Amino acid sequence: MTLSARNQLKGTVKEIQLGGVMAHIGVRVGDNLIESVITRRSAEEMALKKGDAVKVVIKSTEVMLQKD
């Protein structure tokens, strides 16, 4: 998958908190834990689980996740 966003950081899913509508995903990038808030549906469609390798995509207005 090719993205136009240039701020892409490789990390590992460390925390998943599923709510009724939203999901909080904690991703370890080096010594840092970055949290992304995405829809629960997106988290389920990506089949995210602890230990998954993901990319954190940071734009000026949002933080997104990509799983290859």
Give the positions of each predicted feature.
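Non-catalytic connector elements of ABC transporters
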Residues: 1-68
